A protein has these predicted regions:
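Short, mixed-charge, low-aromatic patches
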Residues: 1, 21-25, 75-79
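Single conserved hydrophobic/aromatic residue that forms the stacking wall/gate
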Residues: 1-5, 9-10
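A generic structural signal for short, solvent-exposed coil/turn residues
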Residues: 2, 21-23, 36, 86, ...
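Aromatic-capped interface at the extracytoplasmic side
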Residues: 11-25
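Sequence context surrounding c-type heme c attachment/ligation sites in exported
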Residues: 26-75, 109-190
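Structured, soluble extracytoplasmic/luminal domains of envelope-associated proteins
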Residues: 62-102
Length: 190
């Protein structure tokens, strides 16, 4: 019985390898999404410029910060770090929070622009976070579950409108992402 128990313990631990849910690294500059996205209601796209057009949402450059902070709160210690990086023409070395394995492919534009998925679906209550942390587990099972439960968003997409209408003729259930190939291995794995 102890051998079986040991095997189960090892197997259960393997399922958690690489899961970084709640990971909250210390950043080189204390940045509050609660202030920027919450209090000041700055849209995610303003700083994360690639979210609608790219695989990556992009981590903001010093220049993005300087659009506001060349004049706003320039006397604060954390803002001075931004000013120094700008003056020395050096990037801010942000620590990546949301990591997927190299064997996984994830495209922000496909999910946000085409799929209509809100940032909070994966990133959680970002507008309430003083310090960003990985809200979701971002495991394969977590992604697959989302693809099984999420209805295809056809808003503004004539092709998907036709798919939804055709699906409706043959099924009483709504068209889900899994129904249009959302569970095919090659969609997310190279």
């Amino acid at each position: 019985a102890s051998l079986v128990g040991s095997e189960m313990c090892i197997r259960d631990r393997l399922y958690t390898v690489g899961i970084q849910q709640n990971y909250q690294p210390t950043q080189p500059i204390a940045f509050s999404h609660k202030i920027h996205a919450g209090q000041y209601e700055i849209d995610c796209n303003y700083c994360h410029t690639g979210v609608n057009i790219s695989k990556s949402a992009n981590i903001p450059s010093v220049n993005i910060c300087m659009n506001c902070h060349n004049a706003i709160e320039t006397d604060k210690p954390e803002i001075k770090k931004i000013l120094t990086a700008y003056e020395e023409n050096k990037p801010i070395e942000w620590v990546r929070v949301h990591n997927l394995p190299d064997l996984s492919y994830f495209n922000h534009a496909q999910h946000v622009k085409v799929g209509g998925i809100e940032c909070e679906t994966c990133h959680g209550p970002i507008k309430e976070m003083d310090v960003v942390y990985q809200y979701s587990e971002l495991t394969m099972g977590w992604c697959i579950n989302c693809h099984r439960e999420t209805e295809v968003n056809s808003k503004g997409n004539e092709y998907y409108d036709k798919l939804v209408a055709l699906h409706g003729k043959n099924s009483k259930n709504p068209l889900k992402v899994q129904d249009i190939g959302g569970l095919e291995c090659s969609k997310c794995h190279y």
